[in-house]
Amino acid sequence: MEVPVDSKYQGVSALIRYASILLNYKNSKNLAAYGEKVVSLSNSLNFFAYPLNIINSNNSPEIFKAVKHNFKEKNAEKNVLSLNQADSHFIDSIGVSEIDKNKQLILEAYEHFYNNGNFDKLNRGCYRFLKRIKGVNEYDINDAVIRYMVSTICLRDFSQCYNIIESISQEYTLFDYNIILFFLYLVEGNYKEASTKLLKIKNNIPEEFFEYVKEEDLAFYFAFCLLYNFNNKDYKEVLSNNEIFVYKLYDKYQKFFGIVDMYYKCDYLNVNNEFNTKLKERINKDPFLCGNSDSIEKNFKEKILKEIMSFTNEISFKTIAELLVVNKNKATDMIVNLIESNKLDAVIDDINEIVIMKTPDDMNELLKKSNKTIQKNLDDLIKFSYGNIKHKISHQIEGKGVVRKKLDRGEYDMRMYMMEGGPD
């Protein structure tokens, strides 16, 4: 895998963007590839004085001694805290009032850890700093929050980060720290929680955040989470309430959000085409998503398949393959896996190569009582919101009189549709 190099990324910004690729090589025990990529990346970007130790420089005693010596020389006349004093043990040993008094000195020491890639000490120190400090001007802790995020990502240790950032976000409201939580969940691979935090982001994102995440990348991550964990009501909420999304990202990055709109309109054929031709390649190159690219694609297509199956009681393997933009064998395998894992309540007709949904008894009873009314509403609803793929499955559903749960992705399930008289 080629490590993409963007000339706009310098210093630690470059490390944050590409560190996970290096860690993937290291964790896979492909040490030759790992070493090759470290050397290649460090030569290309030259972002540390000790580039070969960019991941865990604190594990090298020789480098640590050199850093300590250089730090003392650099700050000998500034009365800045020594390296040992600035260690997390220092924060453990002093009171809150002393933390406030020495705050600037502590932050300067953490800047040293940060600039020299000593992420272990930076992470532990920032954690204790953020946990103990109270009533400090929010501008003063912004830097510590961002650097805590950076060190957490580099160390791949998410065990403590969420509680402390949640606590900070509740106490300090000048900036929206949900963006930090969103990004941490995304990098960890918890896309469901990332999507939840996305809904809470309103505005006032710390400017320092954009030193590490480009605006275009943020737009891509937003669109990715909306697609991965799509919910029509959530999408409407984002469109209505998320100021940074509406005013800064949505119109500017239609190449991403246009695909979400296709999903919103049930245009599954084009959604899958766009996924295969655009999103898949970007996911494979993204340092924070590339390690999960196969499972992302699998889950995404399975999610669409389950939604398609909720529209009808039977559909052919061929039609499913066309809608998902996969071959028939892969479509068949997906259906079998969903049924065997109890994610799809259906049976397979091997002779006719179709999959048949099991219809609940209560829905059958409802159908018998109100068949004509329901069928008329279904026909109207198809015309309203399902034109993009009606021609693909109409021959599968005509005359079946099936109550389908979710034809209109925009607002209603079937029960809401019947209660409120259709979409507005």
Where are these regions (language model features)?
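Charged, E/D/K/R/S-rich low-complexity terminal regions of large eukaryotic assembly subunits
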Residues: 1-424
